[in-house]
Amino acid sequence: MAMGRLAHSIVVLAAALAAAVAVRYLDNDYHLRIAFTMCTYYLCAAGMNVLVGYAGQKSLGQAGLFAAGAYAAALTSSHTELSAWLALPLAAAVAALCGVLVALPSLRVKGPYLAMVTLAFGVVVEKLVSEWTDVFGGAQGLYGIRPLTWNDQPFTSEQWVWFGIALCAVTHWLLRNLLAGRFGRALLSLQADEIAAASVGVRVYRAKVMAFVVAAVTCGIAGALVAQQNQYIN
């Protein structure tokens, strides 16, 4: 088992390094933006795999969690003097809190009804950011979002992609190790039969909440990255 994990870690590291080297051969800013967008999509998909693929929970509200992370980073970067780097963990924390709120109904509703509840969360977020213009800027959005920096200089397009690749590799490694253990087995048991899972000691509701939080955090970080790279969000 230990050798298998080590081999997988080496493969992930090698793939990340190969992707980072390949970035040097992308010849224009458009291609670099596409590569960066692929990284953010991977972060969202990795979290969704935990929630849907392992825990079997249906969610249609990930766009709302993406927006929560994006606006948290935008407000932190544009309305405070805090470092843009601190906006990332703050965005993850806000998204995690929203993930807990979305998970609360999962104790009572399941299947398509849970999907409808999560969809309603996304609608509420969309209405909130579009109607509360004093805070979120409404249709005009938020400008002046400070990007991530290196040596006091804003990230270049290449650096954004390199950072995205690094985050994807770390996220993949962390989630794989997390899901290979007790937590992953608990989530798979939920997908198979919640009653049977509870009968063998799995804390069903806690496992559901943790799955929602993991998916929310990855989406929130992806949203924060998009807001900081564009320096504008609406």
Predicted regions and their residues:
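Transmembrane alpha-helices and adjacent helix-loop boundaries
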Residues: M1-N234
